[in-house]
Amino acid sequence: MSLTNFQNEFQKLLDRKYFSPELHPVRKDAFSKFEAIGFPTQKWENWRFTNLSALKENHYLISEVKDAPQKTPDISNYKIEGLQTIVIYNGHFQQDISSVPEGVQLLTGSEYNELKNNQLNHSEKSPFDLLNTAFMDSGVCLIVGKNTIVGTPVRILFISDGDSSIMVNPRLHIDIESGS
């Protein structure tokens, strides 16, 4: 994917009305830094054995509303007894088929950002950190209440239908209160 394609997709993301404009400076700063350094190459010490050419050759699109399933997805092939599951399908949280244990609160990424007044912690250690911050488009937050014992594992299941090359950049937050 060329830098121009990333720039076009980034502008589409900024034009979305359902994201808080207060996040735009964080996004823009991260994207600007990504533009300056680009993808790692094999000349970078930590990436010398990693071939990233497939990332550059494909044209990825950000997930749009049209990418959300029109009906509840069948996840029966992914069922595991004794697990609570949170489902993200093509980048869209599926509340109807997601569950968490008692004492655990589940928020969407937007709800969590509002709760935290859009104060995001983010890393700038690699181009992928920057790209994820610039393109963060969804996500979930689990808040484990004070003195809560969670006896059931929670899994976050990401499903892509594979119909197109969708770029999904979720933010996952797990807040564990004291004594939990």
What residues fall within each predicted segment?
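Glycine-rich and polybasic anion-binding loops at the starts of cofactor/ligand-binding domains
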Residues: 1-180
